[in-house]
Curated annotation (Swiss-Prot):
Class of the enzyme per the UniProt entry, highest EC level: translocase
Keywords per UniProt: Electron transport, Membrane, Mitochondrion, NAD, Respiratory chain, Translocase, Transmembrane, Transmembrane helix, Transport, Ubiquinone
Transmembrane regions listed in the UniProt entry: 1-21, 22-42, 57-77
GO molecular function: NADH dehydrogenase (ubiquinone) activity
Protein name: NADH-ubiquinone oxidoreductase chain 4L
Organism listed in the record: Hypocrea jecorina
Subcellular location per the Swiss-Prot or TrEMBL entry: Mitochondrion membrane
Lineage: Eukaryota, Fungi, Dikarya, Ascomycota, Pezizomycotina
Entry superkingdom: Eukaryota
Annotated family: Belongs to the complex I subunit 4L family.
Length: 89
């Protein structure tokens, strides 16, 4: 349980402190999502419940699709602007 909390906090801190780089922001979001998935998986194993384990697999599949869509948007953003840096005005 504490490992998932540490991973989630690392994801939040990475998202907050790397506001200029889109790739690091996507990685931070994935770390947060996978830490929650790990928490669900550990809880379902401790409770001997198969539904939590299937839900964790479902979350991992959705996270993979999310990563693919995010990277496709990133490629389109790079082609449009020539950079992946975010500029706040």
């Amino acid at each position: 349980m504490s490992l998932t909390l540490v991973l989630f906090l690392i994801g939040i801190l990475g998202f907050v402190f790397n506001r200029k780089n889109i790739i690091l922001m996507l990685i931070s979001i994935e770390i947060m999502l996978l830490s929650i998935t790990f928490l669900i998986l550990v809880s379902s194993i401790n409770l001997d419940d198969i539904i939590g384990q299937t839900y964790a697999i479902y979350i991992i599949v959705v996270a993979g699709a999310e990563s693919a869509i995010g990277l496709a948007i990133l490629v389109a953003f790079y082609r449009l602007r020539g950079s992946i840096a975010i500029e706040y005005k």
